[in-house]
Amino acid sequence: MLDPTFFIELLTVLRNLHAVSANSYTLVNNLRQIIIDNTATLKDLKQLIVNSRSPNSDIPTTSQSTNIIVEVEEISEKNNSNQKQRDEECNDHSDNETDEVPKKKRSQKRKFVLPPEYDENDSRWTLKHRQMAPGLVELMPHTNVYINAIKLSNCKRLSKDCKSLARLLLVEIFTKSALTICSLTGSRARAYDVEGATIRPGLDETARTVLLTYVEEYGREKGWITLDTQSIQNSIRNKMQEFRFKYG
């Protein structure tokens, strides 16, 4: 049986090695709790053995042994249950850090209301700039997809790859309400209660296509790792989900 001092020394080493890591810090705390639980278990077991050997005890040895086993099993089950709960909490924490989109149960249905500017016959209602104006430029020639020239420059300066550029351009081309309400291409809102519609409208198809084309061409110019269109679209969907959970 290992000396509890060993676990304490191991804990100290882990704390020094992983002090800057949030996940490692959680792991260390879990290990510390395991040490505490195991130490308590050892103490309880020791006390049970001492009691069973007490000359003042009138309980038969067989019965005492059975009671010890039962109590030890109960203690072990309790520790295992506590550890399982901590592991689940740790996994939830890791999921939140790994996934860019907050997780919500599907059973929690969300309602959305189409904004006043919604136009069933013209998806350009989703655009921030529907026509040329001072300070705007076309993202690509002859596409009628406009963006603020300074914002475009900032997007290119801040982006480090195709995904980050696509996400930055997304919020400069489409309105906040569109990013909150719409899906990327328009899909049935199966998990939601909907007022006034059964399908989430999609972002303007021309603008979506121009955005993706621009990102791919600019990425090649910069020598970025080439990504397939689906990967970039998934990154855009994640950004839209962020808007939906934050503002929806």
Swiss-Prot record:
- The biased composition feature labelled Basic residues covers 103-112
| The name this protein goes by in its record | Putative BEN domain-containing protein B1
Q: Where is this region: Disordered?
A: 75-115
Q: Which residues form the signal peptide?
A: 1-22
- Give the source's domain of life in one word: Viruses
Q: Give residue ranges for domain BEN.
A: 142-247
Query: What InterPro entries does the record tag this protein with?
Result: BEN_domain (IPR018379)
Q: Which GO molecular function entries does the Swiss-Prot or TrEMBL record give?
A: DNA binding
Annotated keywords = Signal
The residue ranges flagged as biased composition, category Basic and acidic residues, are 84-102
Keyword NADP assigned: no
Origin species = Microplitis demolitor bracovirus (isolate Webb) (MdBV)
Q: Name one Pfam family in it.
A: BEN
